[in-house]
Regions:
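Single conserved hydrophobic/aromatic residue that forms the stacking wall/gate
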Residues: 1-12
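Extracellular beta-rich repeat passengers
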Residues: 13-43, 54-67, 74, 83-184, ...
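Glycine-rich loop(s) and the adjacent beta-strand/alpha-helix scaffold that form part
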Residues: 78-79
Length: 429
C-alpha cells in the first residue's frame, strides 16, 4: 500500500498480499486492479472502513484466495463499505469488480476444482476442494458489509458479481450483507456449503440469488428489490429473483445443487398493487424464481411479488426433482404478477405445476396490495420503505418450519410491529 497524496486515502498498489494486513477506518482504500490475498494471509478490515474500486482499472476487485481469510466484521452503526471511487451521483453499475471468496468446499465440476470465470486459470483464481473437499472450510467473516456498484463483465456469461462465493465452506460467516447496483448478479454461489443470513439485493442488473455447481448451504432472511429500469439484456440473459442450476448443462453431477432458502421477500419491477405494469419495464425481466437444469433447490416461507412471472420449474430434470421431493417450494406466497402469470412450465410439458404448488401449502393472489406495508417507499421512490406485513396479510399465517430440511433454521414468527430493521440507512447513491 502506498500513499497517493490525498489525506486519508491509500491505494492497493501491489496485486498480492501474502502477510496478515489490517485496513483501518481512518483511511479510504482504493483497489486498483485485482487485489489478491493469498498464502494463508488474513486481511482484517475495521468497522466503518470504506474501500473503493477504481473505475479506470478494468475489473478492480478484492479476491480472497484459498486458505486465506477476510475478517470484515462491521456493525450496524459502522458498516464496512465497498463502493465506486466515482463521486456520489456519478457512480454506476459495474464501476468496479466486486468481492470474491474462494474456498475448499464441495464443487460438482470435473476434479472438484474450478476457477473464477473470466480470469486466467491459476492458483490465485482456483476454488473447490478437489477429491477431498473441506465442507467446514473457513474463508473468514463478512458481517455488516455493503457492496455497491460492482459487477464486471469480461465477456457474455463470464462476469464477477457483487459477492461471488466459490466453494466457500460452512466455517465462514456471511451475515448482514447488502449488494446494490451490481452490473450482474447480487450474490452467486458456485458450490460450497456456507450458510448465509440477512442478505439484501437492491436494484441489481441480473439475478438476485444465483446458485450453481452443488451449493448446499442454508440461507435465511433475504430481501430482493428490483428497479423497473434495471435488467439484463434479454439477448444475453434474463433477470430473475432466484436462478438455480445443478450445472451449466443440467447434468447429474454430484453433489447436487440443493441449497435451502427461507424467509425471503422478493419485490419485482411492477411497483403496483395489482398485476399491471406501472410504467415502462425493462425487457430483460422474467421470473421471481427460475429453477432449472436439474437443480434441487428448496424455497420455504417466502414472498415473490410484483414480477412478470412467478415460479418456473424449467425442464424435465427439475420437474422430476419436484415430483420426487428433492426440489421444494413450500409455504410461499406469489402475488401481483403480470396478467396473474404466477406459474410457468415449458411448452409440451405434462408436469402438473398447479398441483405441485397447491399441495405444498403455497398461495397465489392476483394483487399484492394486502401483503406488505410500503414495499416501494413513500411515493414509490424507495425512500423509507416498510417491508413488514400489513394487518391481515397472508404472510402472517402461511409459514411453517415443520419440514425436516428446516431443522437448523431460526423460527421467526411474522409480525406487523417488529422494530428491527437491518436495512435502514444502508443505501448510498
Amino acid at each position: 500500500i502506498r500513499d497517493i497524496g490525498v489525506t486519508g486515502v491509500q491505494t492497493c498498489a501491489l496485486p498480492i498480499f501474502t502477510t496478515n494486513t489490517t485496513w483501518t477506518s481512518n483511511n479510504t482504500y482504493l483497489l486498483q486492479g485485482q487485489i489478491y490475498v493469498k498464502n494463508g494471509a488474513t486481511l482484517t478490515i475495521q468497522p466503518g472502513t470504506v474501500i473503493q474500486g477504481d473505475k479506470t482499472v478494468a475489473g478492480s476487485g478484492l479476491f480472497i484466495c484459498q486458505g486465506s481469510k477476510i475478517v470484515a466484521n462491521g456493525t450496524i452503526n459502522q458498516p464496512i463499505v465497498f463502493t465506486s471511487n466515482q463521486a456520489p451521483g456519478s457512480r454506476a453499475l459495474g464501476d468496479w469488480g466486486g468481492v470474491i471468496l474462494m474456498g475448499k468446499s464441495n464443487l460438482n465440476v470435473a476434479g472438484g476444482i474450478g476457477n473464477i470465470e473470466g480470469l486466467a486459470v491459476s492458483p490465485d483464481t482456483q476454488f473447490g476442494g478437489g477429491a477431498n473437499p473441506d465442507t467446514m472450510d473457513n474463508s473468514g467473516i463478512l458481517r455488516y458489509v455493503r457492496i455497491e456498484f460492482p459487477g464486471y463483465v469480461y465477456q457474455p456469461n463470464k462476469e464477477i458479481n457483487g459477492l461471488t462465493l466459490g466453494a466457500v465452506g460452512k466455517g465462514t460467516t456471511i451475515d448482514y450483507i447488502q449488494v446494490s447496483f451490481s452490473n450482474d448478479d447480487a450474490y452467486e454461489w458456485f458450490g460450497g456449503t456456507v450458510d448465509c443470513r440477512h442478505l439484501v439485493s437492491y436494484r441489481n442488473l441480473d439475478d438476485d440469488f444465483d446458485t450453481d455447481n452443488g451449493f448446499s448451504g442454508k440461507v435465511q432472511f433475504c430481501l430482493g428489490v428490483r428497479d423497473p429500469q434495471i435488467a439484463d439484456n434479454p439477448t444475453v440473459s434474463t433477470s430473475e429473483g432466484f436462478e438455480s442450476d445443478n450445472d451449466a448443462t443440467g447434468s447429474a453431477a454430484l453433489p447436487q445443487t440443493k441449497a435451502i432458502f427461507s424467509n425471503v421477500t422478493w419485490i419485482g419491477p411492477l411497483r403496483g398493487t395489482c398485476p399491471a405494469a406501472q410504467g415502462a419495464i425493462a425487457a430483460g425481466f422474467r421470473r421471481g424464481a427460475r429453477l432449472r437444469r436439474n437443480t434441487a433447490l428448496k424455497i420455504h416461507n417466502s414472498i415473490l411479488m410484483d414480477g412478470m412471472r412467478g415460479l418456473h420449474i424449467d425442464g424435465t430434470a427439475a420437474e422430476g426433482n419436484a415430483t420426487s421431493g428433492k426440489l421444494k417450494f413450500q409455504n410461499n406466497i406469489i402475488a401481483g404478477f403480470l396478467n396473474n402469470y404466477s406459474l410457468e412450465r415449458n411448452a409440451g410439458s405434462t408436469f402438473n405445476i398447479w398441483s405441485f404448488f397447491t399441495t405444498n401449502n403455497n398461495d397465489s393472489v392476483s394483487c399484492s396490495a394486502n401483503i406488505l406495508t410500503l414495499p416501494y417507499g413513500t411515493g414509490g421512490n424507495y425512500l423509507n420503505p416498510d417491508f413488514r406485513p400489513v394487518v391481515g396479510s397472508l404472510a402472517l399465517s402461511n409459514s411453517s418450519f415443520n419440514d425436516a430440511t428446516l431443522a437448523a433454521f431460526t423460527i421467526q414468527a411474522p409480525s406487523t410491529t417488529a422494530t428491527i430493521n437491518y436495512c435502514q440507512g444502508a443505501t448510498s447513491m
